[in-house]
Every structure is written in C-alpha cells, then in structure tokens.
C-alpha cells in the first residue's frame, strides 16, 4: 500500500527506515520551484502575459516560489503601476508583503525579532546570528523556522549556514528600516 502525506511543515514522524529503504519520496521547495515556462503559464492565468525574458526575470526574483509569482502577476495585472517590470518584485509592499506579514504573524515575537535583526546578513551563520540578534540558540531556531517552511534554507557547504529567500529578506529589511 501507499501513503501520501502533504504538509506545509515537515511532520515529526519516523521516516528514517522508509528513507533508508528508498520507500520515501520527499518533495520540497527545490522540486516545487517554478521555471520560466511554468512562471509564464501561471502568470497567464491572471491575464498577465510575459515574454521569455520577463518570465526568466520573475522566476529568478521569486526563486520559483509559486505564491509570489502569482501575487506579482496579479498585482501587475490589477495595478499596472505597482510592478513595472516582471523582475521588479519586492517584499516591501503590495500583495507579497501582505502575504509575508500574514505568514509571520503567528510566529513567536522572539523569532520575529531574530529574523528581522539577522536579515542584515547575506548568509546567516548561527554564531554571528546570535551576536547580531542578541538571542541564543540560533542554530535550533533556524532549523525550527526552516522546518516550518518560512522561506529559510540551509546553504550547502562545510559550515552550517542559512539564507533567507530574497523576498522574505527584502520584507524583513523593510520592516527593520
């Protein structure tokens, strides 16, 4: 038999044996990221027609995040002046900022403080994040926030470092200012 679990956050279930036996298919943010063609198709559903160059710019700026692509296209179609170019998308205002605010609202105040203060870092290294934020347990906090799918990803490399999605970081920096 087969079981499918779809969840926004990674469930705390014992997947080790299934993973070891190659009986587990995990689909994450990287696999769900839209490419330029998929971006074009999604934008067209809002009535916003993109050429190839615009679709590539929007896919790159949103890192393929479907919700951001849709919201940017919707904003462009409904309020042409708010987004002049497909790649001119930010987390500072409009539909994307509204979405990010609603996603951050249920987060603990310390976590919001941590995210906002550490948004000044291009790459978030846990010890540096603790120094910048003034809050302890950065590594555990980053793991927990990443598991909650808050647009935080681990950067591959010899040291454990993290990176915030461009639009999330843009939003947090705007809030910090």
Positions of the model-derived regions?
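Intrinsically disordered, low-complexity boundary segments flanking structured domains
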Residues: 12-16, 86-87, 138-140
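C-terminal boundary/linker of central alpha/beta nucleotide-binding cores
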Residues: 8, 53-55, 97-174
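Alpha-helical sensor/transducer elements of the RecA-like P-loop NTPase core
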Residues: 1-75, 94-101, 167-174
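Generic signal for short, ordered secondary-structure residues
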Residues: 18, 83, 94, 107-108
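Active-site diphosphate/adenylate-binding microenvironment
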Residues: 90
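C-terminal helical "lid" of AAA+/P-loop NTPase domains
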Residues: 42-44, 56-61, 67-79, 85-86, ...
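A general structural signal for well-ordered secondary-structure junctions
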Residues: 1, 24, 49, 68, ...
